[in-house]
């Protein structure tokens, strides 16, 4: 009424924390900090993944969905390779005086099984559609690479960074893998 105003603090300011959605999803994919952060996210998954597959790398295939998860996948792959190389070194050191050439070759040839299990039709962008239309579209966006898994024997580990709706695996992939 008097035309006066004032500024006063009502609530104590809290720590400014960035939302992961804003930080990663809306950033440029070529930003070096985002690239490294996504790789670290993948590396951070290695220990829980190894426990989940009971450390059975011979019967585990690693992949990623959608394409935006590829950088985290590279980080996971690097972490798995570090683990496998440590394992190889331990096996060789433990058996160095008893190793036959064929056993040494078997140990050295061990690799992480990385495959492009799901293939997306890049012309279709499901996150911009709504409701039933989106669900129908999502069900037909992906196909799988047949023969990349041994049925009823292999584990499949997929990094999925579908942070908009998080429905890629549920609505598109799992149905075609069964």
Protein language model features and the residues they cover:
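PRPP-associated nucleotide enzymes
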Residues: 1-178
């Amino acid at each position: 009424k008097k035309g006066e105003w004032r500024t006063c603090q009502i609530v104590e300011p809290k720590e400014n924390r960035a939302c992961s959605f804003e930080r990663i999803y809306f950033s440029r994919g070529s930003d070096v900090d985002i690239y490294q952060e996504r790789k670290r996210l993948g590396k951070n998954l290695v220990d829980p993944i190894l426990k989940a597959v009971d450390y059975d790398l011979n019967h585990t295939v690693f992949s990623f969905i959608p394409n935006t998860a590829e950088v985290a996948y590279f980080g996971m792959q690097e972490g798995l390779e570090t683990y496998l190389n440590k394992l190889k070194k331990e096996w060789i050191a433990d058996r160095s005086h008893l190793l036959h050439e064929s056993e040494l070759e078997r140990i050295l040839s061990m690799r992480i099984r990385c495959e492009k299990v799901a293939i997306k039709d890049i012309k279709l962008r499901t996150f911009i559609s709504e409701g039933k239309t989106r669900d129908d579209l999502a069900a037909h966006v992906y196909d799988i690479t047949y023969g990349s898994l041994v049925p009823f024997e292999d584990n499949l580990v997929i990094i999925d960074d579908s942070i908009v709706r998080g429905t890629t695996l549920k609505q598109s992939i799992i149905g075609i893998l069964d």
